Amino acid sequence: MIPLLLLLACSRPFLDAGPCQERFTGPGIAECEVPGWEDRAYDLVLPPDYDGETPVPLVLALHGGGGNKQAAERTTCSEGEVEDESCLHKHAQDNGYAVLFPNGTGFGLLPELRTWNAGGGDDEWRCASGKACERGIDDVGYIQDLLDDVEGRAAIDTSRIYATGLSNGGAMSHRLACELSDRITAIAAVGGANQFTTTGTCAPERPVPVLHVHGTADPCWSYEQGSPDCPVGGGDLPHVGVDRTMDEWAALLGCDGGTVEEALPDTAQDGTTTVRITWTGCEAPLEHLRVEGGGHAWPDGYAYLKEKTIGPVPRDWGNELIWDFLGAQEL
C-alpha cells in the first residue's frame, strides 16, 4: 500500500508531548502507552483550565490510513504547523475540552505508517484499511482499553466522549458508532464513510448523533461508490458511497421527516462551497456537510499532498463547525 498520508507521517514538527503521569492533576500534553497494546501509544492534550478534578469532554482524533498520531495532530492545522491557532487541539484548549491522538497499527519496514480496521474486506468490498483490516486487528477492543486508560489517568466527562477522523479514521469513527455506542457519544467523520456495514451489521445500543463531512471531488474516497483514484493502493475494490452511509444512519436513527438543506457562507472563495443537510424526525441528530468541489482533506486543514492528488482543501470553515456539532451532544 502506498500510504495516503505519507508526507504527514514523515513531516515535523509534532506536539511536544511530555512523560505520562499516573494521574494528571493539571493541564499539559503527554504521551502514554495503552496497557496490553505494544507500540500503540497515544498523545493526550488537556486544556489550560484542567484542574484534575472537574471532568472535561474528550475528542478522539483518528489519523488517516498510512498516518499516525503525529500526522493527525497536523492534519487539522491549516498550514500543518502544530502551534497554529487553527488546529483542533488549539481549538480544544480555547474551548475547554481534551483531545486524544491514538496510533493505529503499523507493519513491516515502515511501522509508523499505520492503519485502522474500519471494516469491509471480501470479494466485493475494499478492506478499510490495509493490513489492520486484512489481519482483523481488534481496534474496537483497542479503543475500549485506550479509553479505560485515559479515564483512569484524567478526569474525563464520560457522557461527552466523541470520535472524529479523516479517511480511514473517519470510517473507523463510523464503526465505533456502530459497535461502541455505550461510550462514544457522537461522531464527526471526514472523508471516510461507513465501510463496516458492507460486511458487518451496525447495531448501536443507543441512537448515536452522526455528522458526516465529504467532498464531492474527493478522489481518494469518492463521494459515489467507487475505487480510489489516488496513491492508496489496494486494487480495484470500491469504498462505500456517502448516500448509502447516510441512508443507513437515517434508517437506524428512525428519521421520518425528510431533509432540510442550507447553503453555508462562501467566505474563502476557494472553488468549494458547503451545503448542510439535516435529517428531521430522528431519534438523534444526523447531519451531512456536503463540500461541493472539495477533496480528500480536513476542512481548513493541512494540504498534505498536491491538489492534483487529493483535490482542493475547503477553507470556508473548519474545526469550529465540527466542535459545534459534537459539543452539543451528551449521553
Language-model segments: residues:
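The feature captures the conserved acid-bearing segment of alpha/beta-hydrolase catalytic domains
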Residues: 185-283, 293, 320
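Acidic glycine-/aspartate-rich tracts in secreted/extracellular proteins
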Residues: 49-50, 65-67, 105-109, 217-219, ...
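Sec-dependent N-terminal signal peptides
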Residues: 1-9
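Serine-hydrolase catalytic machinery in alpha/beta-hydrolase-like enzymes
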Residues: 33, 38-43, 53-162, 172-175, ...
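Alpha/beta-hydrolase
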Residues: 60-62, 190, 291
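Extracellular secreted precursors and ectodomains with disulfide-bonded cysteine-rich loops/domains
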Residues: 8, 18-19, 30, 75, ...
